[in-house]
């Protein structure tokens, strides 16, 4: 039996059959009226979902958690740490892997230690920049060549990311990024970029690699709008590599890269 649980942006947990209807997520007030506001805890050998409020009662019990989640506090190790502290089994990455997977700086530092190829980068905390913006700008430009791409280190979905071709644009990009995160990553922009994705499933002893996906973008990077809105529509499109040249697709599966490059992508993914 699948028991749906929804975590709101204000960190409240809800459960109920109504959550199986995707339309209900368009109206949060309706969702909250129809679902049960609950907390998860361990009681007498069971993991229970108990209702909040005056009349507290056990709404359901669960055996294992499937964190099918996206965003801050749920895919960055916070939720995984909570589940682990309670003791409930859960699928997917553990706390450490979730943290490293979400923090771009941590990930790059680990890749560097393993001699994996990465783009030239630097990073800083917002207070370091705010204390002396000119000094930090000079440090960045001494280490990296323009154009650069500025990213909040711990966010996803391309939120807060900007490309800077000039020093003035770099300042604007940083000012934008620090409104989203206190930790900022700056990388040299890869020119004539062909962006590909590959997934691994399993662990270091036994894993499988996915097909390689090519990301199609009209910008210097795949933007939030392209990822989720797609030419004014909800989401981009996916086509095969044999699709029409005129198709305005966001992704191409499999990627249209040569066999040698495909093997290199698989090799690096396996090492990572």
Predicted regions and their residues:
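Active-site nucleotide/adenylate-binding loops and adjacent lid/helix of ATP-dependent enzymes
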Residues: 1, 55-59, 98-194, 204-205
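ATP-binding N-terminal substructure of ATP-dependent carboxylate-amine bond-forming enzymes
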Residues: 1-96, 100-106, 125-135
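A short, local hydrophobic-aromatic micro-motif
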Residues: 3, 91, 119-120, 187, ...
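Short, acidic Gly/Pro/Ser/Thr-rich loop/turn segments
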Residues: 12, 73-74, 157, 205-207, ...
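Aromatic/hydrophobic pocket-lining residues that form π-stacking "cages" and hydrophobic walls in ligand
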Residues: 79, 173, 269
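ATP-dependent carboxylate activation and anion-phosphoryl transfer catalytic cores
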Residues: 115, 139, 256-272
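Phosphate-binding site of ATP-dependent enzymes
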Residues: 162-245, 252, 256-264
């Amino acid at each position: 039996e699948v028991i749906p649980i929804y975590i709101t942006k204000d960190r409240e947990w809800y459960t109920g059959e109504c959550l199986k209807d995707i339309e209900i997520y368009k109206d949060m007030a309706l969702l909250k009226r129809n679902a049960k506001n609950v907390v998860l805890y361990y009681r007498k050998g069971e993991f229970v979902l108990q209702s909040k409020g005056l009349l507290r009662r056990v709404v359901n019990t669960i055996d294992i958690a499937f964190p099918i989640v996206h965003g801050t506090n749920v895919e960055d190790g916070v939720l995984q740490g909570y589940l682990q502290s309670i003791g409930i089994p859960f699928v997917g990455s553990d706390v450490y892997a979730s943290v490293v997977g979400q923090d771009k700086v941590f990930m790059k530092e680990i890749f560097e230690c393993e001699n994996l190829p990465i783009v030239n980068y630097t990073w800083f905390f917002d207070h370091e920049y705010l204390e002396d913006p000119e000094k930090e700008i000079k440090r960045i430009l001494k280490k990296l060549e323009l154009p650069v791409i500025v990213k909040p280190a711990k966010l996803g979905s391309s939120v807060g990311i900007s490309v800077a071709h000039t020093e003035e644009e770099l300042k604007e990009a940083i000012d934008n990024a620090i409104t989203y995160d206190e930790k900022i990553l700056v990388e040299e922009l890869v020119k004539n970029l062909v962006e590909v994705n590959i997934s691994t499933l399993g662990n270091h002893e036994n894993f499988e690699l996915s097909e390689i996906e090519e990301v199609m973008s009209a910008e210097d990077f795949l933007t939030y709008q392209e990822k989720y809105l797609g030419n004014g529509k909800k989401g981009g499109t996916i086509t095969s590599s044999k699709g029409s040249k005129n198709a305005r697709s966001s992704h191409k599966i499999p990627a249209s890269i040569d066999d040698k490059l495909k093997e290199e992508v698989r090799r690096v993914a396996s090492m990572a």
